[in-house]
Amino acid sequence: MRSFTRKHFVVLSLIGLGIAGVMATVHAFAQTANGAAYVIVERLTTTGPESIQQEYGKVSRDIVAKFGGRYLARSQQNTLLEGEGTVPCCMAIISFPSTEAAKNWFSSPENQDAAKIRRSGATFRIVSVQGVP
């Protein structure tokens, strides 16, 4: 009977880590591919100084990240491609791993506290859109 040496243990550990890494990647890809959600933020009117929105932006980034969110776009230069009406002056698109993560972010106490800052200087429309698998 052969005994395991330190070398065997290291090799088996590396194989185990490799399998775990592949499984984590597959799980993350499957979750994103099947359940991603995108939050579209539109600033409709500005009622206070721009510094209020800058303060909100600094606070909100960490909160979004805490819930697995990532900003895909932020812009103050938006173009109306079809339809009528005014184009929101500022827009953002945030991706989340799932609709549940987006809802948890939005309803979290941290985000609701930050929203008070946001709302003190503007009105917004915020919509969650289910991603395509």
Question: PLM features: residue spans?
Answer:
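Single-residue recognition of alpha-helix capping/boundary positions
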Residues: 8, 101, 110-111
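Short, exposed beta-strand-loop hairpins at the edges of beta-sheets
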Residues: 103-106, 113-118
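Alpha-helix boundary/capping and short turn/kink residues
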Residues: 50, 108-111
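Short S/T/G/P-rich N-terminal loop/turn motif that feeds into the first structured element of a domain
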Residues: 19-103, 130-133
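Bacterial N-terminal signal peptides that target proteins for export
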Residues: 2-15
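C-terminal end-helix/capping segment
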Residues: 119-133
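A short, aromatic/hydrophobic, helix- or strand-capping loop or linear motif
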Residues: 68, 115-122
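Helix-centric, low-specificity signal for extended rod-like, repetitive segments
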Residues: 1, 20, 36, 111-112
